[in-house]
Amino acid sequence: MISKAIIKKVSIAPRKARLVVDLIRGKEIKVAKAILMFTPKSASSIVLKLLNSAEANLAQNINLKSNDFYISEVYVNEG
């Protein structure tokens, strides 16, 4: 099952956000959250909120534990 979360109107440069997003691509949710909590970049808090939203969407829809989730695809586009 795939969960999707989108955030719009964020005032941060895509180049800076891509540095953070590249750190968590392909990781499990638990590991990605730990990485984002200890990454000293301004985009890490934004990506963490987005990750929590995607996890909540998926957990609510199919009632699975968060240990089963991983990040298959994440990207940053320019506005």
From Swiss-Prot:
Coiled-coil regions listed in the entry: none
Quaternary context: Part of the 50S ribosomal subunit.
Gene3D superfamilies: Ribosomal protein L22/L17 (3.90.470.10)
One cellular component (GO) term of this entry: cytosolic large ribosomal subunit
Key words of the record: Ribonucleoprotein, Ribosomal protein, RNA-binding, rRNA-binding
Keyword hit for rRNA-binding: yes
An individual GO BP term: translation
GO molecular-function terms, A-Z: rRNA binding; structural constituent of ribosome
Family membership: Belongs to the universal ribosomal protein uL22 family.
Matching SUPFAM superfamilies: Ribosomal protein L22
Entry superkingdom: Bacteria
Protein name as annotated: Large ribosomal subunit protein uL22
Pfam families in alphabetical order: Ribosomal_L22
Biological function: This protein binds specifically to 23S rRNA; its binding is stimulated by other ribosomal proteins, e.g. L4, L17, and L20. It is important during the early stages of 50S assembly. It makes multiple contacts with different domains of the 23S rRNA in the assembled 50S subunit and ribosome.
